[in-house]
């Protein structure tokens, strides 16, 4: 068994202890001061982002959230990655209970914090980290805590993420395949970074203990099995499944089989790092006239098939900080000047595929401008959009089956959405 945590500390931004829980008796509260000293020493180091530090026989693993440090100290040869993952789950649980994890919420709810730390870790080993399950027997009401005498079924059940006895009048499953496109284009029009981060997000409202089976399109399945495919295979990376997925079954026949938690959760996340063609391309031509007037010609072109349509398109165009009196014309949509952003915001509700639209704008500048004025740093063009019924990767859900011993019929709903993530073009 991997080494255990000796203690867990919650520290403020200055390194002062807010709460700490000793699990094994082999460290003291002084460990917090030694950790923070190491943290300060690391600030000037090129590896300062390393979440693990070692000092005098003690390993420190930490994460920072808002103005709080969560730190585990251990004297054993522990699995640092596992304990760091546990700290992130602690953050999720605290946010579930207190909405915001920050110094004030910990001080106001320190009794609940101690109770949660006792349930989430036992003798230094992680235990229950599902917020829904913990909330069944650790309840808060105006900073009061109630502890039920009998633990919920989910704690003693093999399926710890789902309680027994769940009932719904209408049994439904909603599955959203959401992909975020990240693109960075430099001033020469070259793509310097592109990837797609995807997630299969589920919301389940099902009675009992249902068994779900999900099948993806052949290009994903066959690629995973190393067999030949028709057309281009989908090369997904960094695939992560929710703990409910039977990994042994997936390794055997690539079937995603699981008993789902109740409510919303991420069934699977993945990344696609192959070169992605920009779905919306923006070109900008800027002309300055005797330093008193600037004209902009912007062309926005959709580079996806005509059968798809982008919605809620928003193109943020940087303008000089001292610009004023804008005059704007667009061939589609509307544009408004946002002086607080030093930008012109072009909004298009519906942008069909394989189309191009233009925006012309004219701004006035102060009539007197210093000849030696330092050129200001150019902000990038930022683009936001959503494309329903479309995925960049081509991933598709072939089937979603719900089987429950009572034999009820459940309605599965599947939709696809591609969205802009960090989508920037440094063309201006």
UniProtKB/Swiss-Prot annotation:
CDD domains: AP-1_Mu1_Cterm, AP1_Mu_N
Top-level taxon in the UniProt lineage: Eukaryota
Chief localization: Golgi
Pfam family, one: Clat_adaptor_s
Disrupted-gene phenotype: Short pollen tube growth and failure to exit the style. Compromised cytokinesis due to the mislocalization of the KNOLLE syntaxin. Full spectrum of growth defects, suggestive of compromised auxin signaling and of defective RLK signaling. Cell morphogenesis was also disturbed. Impaired pollen function and growth retardation phenotype.
Keyword annotations from UniProtKB, A to Z: Cytoplasmic vesicle, Endosome, Golgi apparatus, Membrane, Protein transport, Transport
UniProt-listed InterPro entries: Adaptor_comp_med_subunit, AP2_Mu_C_sf, AP_mu_sigma_su, Clathrin_mu, Clathrin_mu_CS, Longin-like_dom_sf, MHD
GO biological process, one term: clathrin-coated vesicle cargo loading, AP-1-mediated
Tissues in which the protein is found: Ubiquitous.
Family note: Belongs to the adaptor complexes medium subunit family.
Name recorded for this polypeptide: AP-1 complex subunit mu-2
The organism of origin for this protein: Arabidopsis thaliana (Mouse-ear cress)
């Amino acid at each position: 068994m991997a080494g255990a945590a000796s203690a867990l500390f919650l520290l403020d931004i200055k390194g002062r202890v807010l709460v700490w829980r000793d699990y094994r008796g082999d460290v003291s509260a002084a460990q917090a001061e030694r950790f923070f000293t190491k943290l300060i020493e690391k600030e000037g180091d090129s590896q300062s982002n390393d979440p693990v530090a070692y000092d005098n026989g003690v390993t420190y693993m930490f994460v920072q959230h808002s103005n709080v440090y969560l730190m585990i100290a251990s004297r054993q040869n522990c699995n640092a990655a596992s304990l760091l993952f546990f700290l992130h789950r602690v953050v999720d649980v605290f946010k579930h209970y207190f909405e915001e994890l920050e110094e004030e919420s910990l001080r106001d709810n320190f009794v609940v914090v101690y109770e949660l730390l006792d349930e989430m870790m036992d003798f230094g080993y992680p235990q229950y980290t599902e917020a829904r399950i913990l909330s069944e027997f650790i309840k808060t009401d105006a900073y009061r805590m109630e502890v039920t005498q009998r633990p919920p079924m989910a704690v003693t059940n093999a399926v710890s993420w789902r309680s027994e006895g769940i009932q719904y009048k209408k049994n439904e499953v909603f599955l959203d395949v959401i992909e975020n496109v990240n693109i960075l284009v430099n001033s020469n029009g070259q793509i310097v970074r592109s990837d797609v981060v995807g997630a299969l997000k589920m919301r389940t409202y099902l009675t009992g203990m249902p068994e779900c089976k999900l099948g993806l399109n052949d290009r994903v399945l066959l690629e995973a099995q190393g067999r030949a495919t028709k057309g281009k295979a989908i090369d997904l990376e960094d695939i992560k499944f929710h703990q409910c997925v039977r990994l042994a079954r997936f390794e055997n026949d690539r079937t995603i089989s699981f008993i789902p938690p109740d409510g919303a959760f991420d069934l699977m996340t993945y990344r696609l790092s192959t070169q992605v063609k920009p779905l919306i391309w923006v070109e900008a031509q800027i002309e300055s006239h005797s330093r008193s007037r600037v004209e902009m010609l912007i062309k926005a072109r959709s580079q996806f098939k005509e059968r798809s349509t982008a919605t809620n398109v928003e193109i943020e165009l940087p303008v000089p900080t001292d610009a004023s009196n804008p005059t704007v014309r667009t061939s589609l949509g509307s544009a408004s000047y946002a002086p607080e952003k030093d930008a012109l915001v072009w909004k298009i509700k519906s942008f069909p595929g394989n189309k191009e639209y233009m925006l012309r704008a004219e701004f006035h500048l102060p009539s007197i401008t210093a000849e030696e004025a330092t050129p200001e740093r150019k902000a990038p063009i930022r683009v936001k959009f959503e494309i329903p019924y479309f995925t960049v990767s081509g991933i598709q859900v072939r089937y979603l089956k719900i089987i429950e011993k009572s034999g009820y019929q459940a309605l599965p709903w599947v939709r696809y959405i591609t969205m802009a993530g960090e989508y920037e073009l440094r063309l201006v």
